[in-house]
Design a protein with these regions (language model features):
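Conserved pre-motif C helix in the palm subdomain of viral-like polymerases
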Residues: 184-215, 295-321
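Extended, charge-enriched "interface" segments that sit outside catalytic cores
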Residues: 173
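Conserved polymerase palm-domain catalytic core
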Residues: 163, 167, 232-333, 337-354, ...
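C-terminal, surface-exposed recognition/capping segments
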Residues: 2-70
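Active-site-proximal segment of RNA-dependent polymerases
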Residues: 116-119, 202-261
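Non-catalytic, polymerase-adjacent accessory regions of viral genome-replication enzymes
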Residues: 67-158
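Right-hand nucleic-acid polymerase module
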Residues: 69-93, 97-103, 190-191, 195, ...
Length: 459
């Protein structure tokens, strides 16, 4: 196939590794196959775009991916059934832009995934789609499209199920809009019928298959995980480091430059292809290529892209945990923190992380990726973490967060005082920030903020 060349790539992503290792076989959460759409900080399922940790549902933007890499058996080559103990090599997905030598990280170890009995019917069957519609309606029943679909639920579900089974179902058009908090980004919204199908596909097949084999400290967008989980794990790592090495240590913190905008479609599809059977993979690629044309980049808005977001960097997690043996490592989407005893180890980790990201088509964000002393504190997921001389891990709200809150609440209070907004809306917004601050060691800050908030209404 034009644009696809065979090239052996090493399973070990550490330069100079003495032996190749299959780093995808470990399963930290073997029983964590529960369905989920999007999780808030506590890990509970939530359809509300405003209530999850990213302030938006998943993602969108891009280009049509190149063909996914196949196994030797799929290509009809001899030796596909060999019992040779050496790990199976993968084809390399390379388009015209890859001629310069950019390597694909698409390695599919082991046999091709197979459908479980009843799995396909559990995705496109009537009962599965009906349950998916009932889950998707939460928080959006005020929309005409949702109300119309639910009013004719049985008829619409039966029609969709038949189209999916005979191959005539087509995804609808998407709609783009911008959000400004917590940072400016473009969101892609899909129609309610498409959401019903995609949720059934993701919840009943893609999500449970993809999370199988994740390391425990891949913390984003999974059941029983989330921002609260990631923060508590980081605090535990700081205490563990103190018990072994005292208060002195070094932090290797990385951030991927433009994670979703720079995500290559062939890499995202290859991550899915390693774990999804061909029937499910065909539906997944149809959705992704319809919603995200091009070859590079996604924008938030799709549940499937959020799953891709937590899956694409799985090789990085296994390199850190399994190959390098870094126990004190946590990753939340594209932000990762590793705590190490010496500066030399932290710098080696930074170099290895950068090399691995490069093979996946990413680069480190030079402003946010750095090696620094543990005593300086760690900024992670909206809080500043500090380790005391007695080994206690403290978590404080970032000062910039407090400043933004006061500016926003002050503006809302003025609108309420002029009759342009209900005070209950202002109270709700302040209470939301207060709940966020209460997750940290913020007793004094909350007491001062409460006094400040009461004073707003006396002006």
């Amino acid at each position: 196939m034009e644009g696809i060349r065979r090239q052996e790539i090493r399973a070990s992503v550490i330069a100079g590794a003495a032996a190749e290792q299959n780093v995808w076989t470990r399963s930290a959460y073997r029983n964590d196959g529960s369905n989920t759409f999007i999780v808030i900080s506590s890990g509970h399922v939530s359809n509300s775009n405003a209530q999850n940790g990213n302030r938006c549902a998943p993602d969108r933007t891009g280009a049509s991916p190149t063909e996914a890499c196949g196994t030797a058996a799929e290509r009809g080559e001899t030796g596909a059934g060999s019992r040779d103990p050496e790990p199976e090599r993968a084809d390399q997905c390379r388009g015209d832009a890859d001629a310069a030598g950019t390597r694909s990280a698409a390695v599919r170890p082991g046999p091709e995934p197979k459908l479980e009995p009843g799995e396909l019917n559990g995705v496109v069957g009537f009962l599965a789609l009906r349950e998916s519609a009932r889950e998707c309606r939460h928080g959006v029943m005020w929309k005409d499209s949702t109300a119309s679909y639910m009013l004719n639920l049985s008829e619409r579900t039966l029609a969709m199920s038949r189209k999916l089974q005979d191959g005539t179902f087509r995804c609808g058009k998407t709609r783009e809009f911008d959000i400004t908090r917590p940072k400016r980004r473009t969101i892609v919204s899909v129609g309610f019928a498409d959401r019903v199908f995609q949720r059934s596909l993701n919840d009943n097949s893609i999500y449970p298959r993809m999370v199988h084999g994740f390391v425990k400290d891949n913390a984003a967008c999974q059941k029983d995980k989330g921002t609260d989980y990631a923060r508590e794990r980081l605090k535990e790592f700081m205490r563990r480091h103190y018990r072994r090495h005292g208060p002195n240590g070094w932090v290797c913190q990385i951030d991927v430059a433009g994670y979703y905008p720079n995500m290559r479609h062939d890499v995202a599809e290859a991550a899915f292809a390693r774990k999804l059977p061909p029937e499910i993979m065909a539906m997944a690629t149809a959705v992704m290529r319809n919603q995200y044309p091009g070859e590079v980049g996604y924008n938030p808005g799709s549940q499937m892209i959020q799953i891709a977001g937590i899956s694409v960097l799985d090789p990085l997690d296994h390199m850190a945990k399994d190959l390098m043996g870094i126990r004190n490592y946590i990753r939340y989407m594209d932000d990762a923190v590793a705590i190490l005893p010496t500066r030399e180890e932290a710098e080696r980790a930074m170099a290895a992380f950068g090399d691995t990201l490069h093979t996946l088509g990413f680069e480190l964000n030079p402003k946010k990726s750095r090696v620094y002393p543990l005593r300086d504190g760690i900024e992670f997921l909206g809080f500043d973490f500090h380790l005391t001389d007695t080994g206690k891990a403290l978590m404080f709200v970032k000062p910039s967060n407090v400043k933004d809150m006061r500016r926003r609440i002050r503006r809302m209070a003025r609108l309420a005082q002029t009759g342009k907004m209900y005070r209950s809306e202002v109270d709700g917004s302040y209470q939301g920030w207060r709940d966020h601050a209460s997750k940290g060691d913020s007793f004094g800050l909350i007491r001062r903020s409460d006094a400040w908030y009461k004073g707003l209404w006396k002006e």
